[in-house]
């Protein structure tokens, strides 16, 4: 394909580009259509019609064209990952693994990610500058945790005041620890100073407890969470929260957050509350499904599999409850370490749970809306940024194609051809 077209990758062309011969699945939920797509100055000029005489042609015969995929729950800094969350490698190795992770992510068709904890602003800036290929990154910077909460990932015997030493300025920013509204307000402001585009708080324990926490724990008070919401609103952005149990979720909704991460224990009553307050949900099924199959990947005993299996089943039920209640349900992978190259599995899990079209909508239009970029991303429509992915094969008919990254034959990012020729 690359040899046939002669189109180089990596640069935005001044000449208009006409995508010819593909089947367009535009992300709106409408039926697929055989239509050309005209790209001009990094945006979609129109869908359909005939090719302008002066436009360069990119042959997309046999490809299913979808909007650039969005993963709304990633940890790009967790590319080198050890179950103990201690790094025994150099900063150079950490950076190299993160850069490879970014390249693999965009090559898999994810043109945008929302990093929900782990990277400092530097990584997003490097990609934005064009020095390195990778997805567009919206980052929260360091997550906000109470002392002893999920964001304090050092050993239990490690003094709290040493936790900041785990960060790598400009590259890795794990978390800031706060106790009380005033300290949290200061740390949220510090996160914004360091380039955060939104705020993430940890308000319940995790399924895989890093220290002494449990999924049933609630963390931060409603008053503390409300302070973070106030600071985020002052900057025109929002707060999302890591939350599994219903009590923590209800506290966060009462405080004014806009999004819930994971939400694995959401029941019908809580789902109705989310819908009432227009709070979105970003479920993360893949990480739990993977751990059910291989608990040792997180250093867990085989006996942990039964607990993980219960949470995986509950998470699937939570997605269905939220969808039935009318909640905006996005999509996130939450993958860690080298397994991040398998983030596309999330679409397959969701396709099997709901439908391929709904999985695609969650990974495009709905995610774009959740992360605040709905005016520019998420659909193949006139005026949107030209983030487009071409699959060799139809993932709506064969959802396994979502997870087969070698079928991603074309990736455009703001009109730049990032990948062309694979899978044909």
Regions found by a protein language model. Give the residues of each.
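Active-site mouth loops of central-metabolism enzymes
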Residues: 83-96, 163-186, 238-240
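Divalent metal-dependent hydrolysis catalytic cores, especially in the metallo-beta-lactamase
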Residues: 96-123, 134-143, 196-210, 238, ...
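Histidine/acidic residue-rich metal-binding segments in metalloenzymes
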Residues: 181-281, 297, 308-329, 375
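Histidine-rich, glycine-flanked metal-binding segment
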Residues: 2-18, 24-67
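C-terminal cap of metal-dependent C-N hydrolases
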Residues: 22-25, 362-365, 369, 382-424
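His/Asp/Glu-enriched, well-ordered alpha-helical/loop segment
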Residues: 234, 299-303, 311-395
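Metal-associated gating/positioning segment near the N- to mid-region
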Residues: 63-129, 147-154, 223, 254-255
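Histidine/acidic-residue-rich catalytic or RNA/ligand-binding cores of hydrolases
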Residues: 80-83, 125, 151, 209-210, ...
């Amino acid at each position: 394909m690359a040899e046939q077209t002669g189109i180089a990758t990596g640069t935005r062309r001044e000449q208009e580009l006409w995508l010819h011969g593909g089947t367009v699945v535009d992300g709106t939920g409408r039926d697929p259509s055989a239509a050309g797509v005209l790209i001009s100055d990094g945006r979609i000029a129109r869908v359909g019609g005939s090719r302008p005489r002066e436009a360069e042609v990119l042959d997309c015969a046999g490809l299913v064209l979808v909007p650039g995929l969005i993963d709304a729950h990633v940890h790009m800094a967790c590319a080198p990952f050890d179950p103990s969350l201690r790094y025994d490698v150099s900063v150079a190795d950490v950076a190299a693994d993160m850069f490879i992770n970014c390249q693999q992510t965009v090559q898999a068709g994810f043109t945008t990610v929302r990093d929900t904890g782990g990277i400092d602003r530097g990584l997003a800036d490097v990609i934005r500058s064009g020095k390195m290929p990778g997805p567009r990154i919206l980052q929260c910077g360091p997550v906000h945790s109470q002392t002893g909460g999920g964001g304090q990932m050092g050993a239990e015997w490690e003094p709290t005041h040493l936790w900041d030493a785990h960060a790598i300025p400009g590259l890795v920013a794990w978390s800031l620890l706060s106790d009380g509204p005033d300290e949290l307000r200061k740390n949220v402001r510090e996160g914004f100073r360091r380039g955060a585009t939104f705020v993430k708080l940890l308000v319940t324990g995790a399924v895989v407890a890093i220290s002494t926490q449990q999924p049933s724990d609630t963390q931060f008070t409603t008053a503390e969470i409300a302070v973070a919401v106030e600071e985020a609103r002052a900057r025109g952005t929002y707060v999302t929260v890591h939350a599994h149990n219903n009590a923590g979720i209800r506290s966060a909704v009462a405080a004014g957050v806009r999004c819930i991460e994971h939400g694995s224990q959401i029941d019908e009553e809580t789902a109705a509350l989310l819908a009432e307050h227009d709070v979105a949900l970003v479920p993360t099924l893949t990480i739990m499904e993977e751990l059910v199959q291989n608990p040792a990947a997180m250093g867990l005993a085989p006996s942990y599999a039964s607990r993980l299996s219960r949470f995986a089943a509950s998470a699937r039920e939570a997605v269905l409850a939220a969808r039935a209640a009318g909640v905006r349900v996005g999509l996130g992978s939450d993958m860690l370490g080298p397994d991040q190259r398998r983030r596309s599995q999330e679409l397959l899990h969701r396709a099997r749970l709901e439908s391929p079209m709904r999985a695609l909508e969650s990974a495009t239009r709905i995610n774009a809306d959740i992360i605040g970029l709905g005016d520019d991303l998420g659909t193949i429509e006139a005026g949107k940024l030209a983030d487009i992915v071409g699959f060799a094969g139809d993932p709506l008919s064969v959802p396994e194609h979502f997870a087969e990254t070698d079928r991603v034959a074309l990736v455009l990012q703001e009109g730049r051809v990032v990948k062309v020729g694979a899978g044909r």
